[in-house]
């Protein structure tokens, strides 16, 4: 029996950072720092598969903090994510990294929810920052990107934008920062029937 394409119906938001004095070329921050960031985000035991940023309306109201979902995690499973994550090397002049994910929902002419989008943000800073700076920069850039998603499609905003952010001030040689949405539950669209 055929089945249609999958779409997520339950998601969680999470974030993590990692740093290390050790790493392997050509991107030393991808080795130990990335693993540490995944551990802090509580998704270290998944096989991570990145998505682009289109959200079905079934996710509206169904994006939870990671701590509400960890009891359902399966070691070695595939986790599909929308992730803003990057690493940096202090010797390249980066002292801090901020990341974020923003979500917007669109409505039709009758005000009904129709669909959503997520956008990612990454910024490198030449000095240390604090949470206020990380949050304000993330919101500024994510808001601009979310509005672009709606304007590009001539769709009106259904509800307030949602923002999630994270940051790291790098003390060691290498650092990594990530903010992510992970998708846990799925349904299938109706299968295509070609006549």
Swiss-Prot record:
Keywords: Cytoplasm, Decarboxylase, Lyase, Pyruvate, Virulence. It is an enzyme of class 4 (lyase). It holds the Pfam family PvlArgDC. Its EC number is 4.1.1.19. The keyword Cytoplasm applies. Binds 1 pyruvoyl group covalently per subunit. It comes from the Bacteria. GO terms for biological process: arginine catabolic process. It catalyses: L-arginine + H(+) = agmatine + CO2. Part of the AaxABC system, catalyzes the decarboxylation of L-arginine. The arginine uptake by the bacterium in the macrophage may be a virulence factor against the host innate immune response. This is Pyruvoyl-dependent arginine decarboxylase AaxB. It comes from Chlamydia trachomatis serovar A (strain ATCC VR-571B / DSM 19440 / HAR-13). The lineage of its organism: Bacteria, Pseudomonadati, Chlamydiota, Chlamydiia, Chlamydiales. The gene is aaxB.
């Amino acid at each position: 029996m055929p089945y249609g394409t999958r779409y997520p119906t339950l998601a969680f938001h999470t974030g993590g950072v990692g740093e290390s004095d050790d790493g392997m070329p050509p991107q030393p921050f991808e080795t130990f720092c990335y693993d540490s960031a995944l551990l802090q985000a509580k998704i270290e035991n998944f096989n991570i598969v990145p998505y682009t940023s289109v959200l079905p309306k079934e996710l509206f109201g169904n994006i939870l903090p990671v701590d509400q979902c960890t009891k359902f995690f399966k070691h070695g499973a595939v986790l599909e994510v929308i992730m803003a994550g990057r690493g940096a090397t202090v010797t390249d002049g980066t002292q801090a990294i901020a990341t974020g994910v923003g979500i917007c929902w669109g409505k039709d002419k009758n005000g009904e929810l129709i669909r959503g989008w997520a956008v990612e943000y990454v910024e490198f800073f030449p000095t240390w920052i604090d949470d206020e700076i990380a949050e304000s920069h993330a919101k500024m850039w994510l808001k601009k990107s979310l509005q672009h998603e709606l304007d590009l499609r001539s769709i009106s905003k259904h509800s307030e934008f949602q923002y999630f952010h994270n940051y790291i001030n790098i003390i060691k040689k290498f650092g990594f920062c990530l903010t992510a949405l992970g998708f846990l539950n799925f349904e299938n669209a109706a299968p295509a029937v070609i006549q």
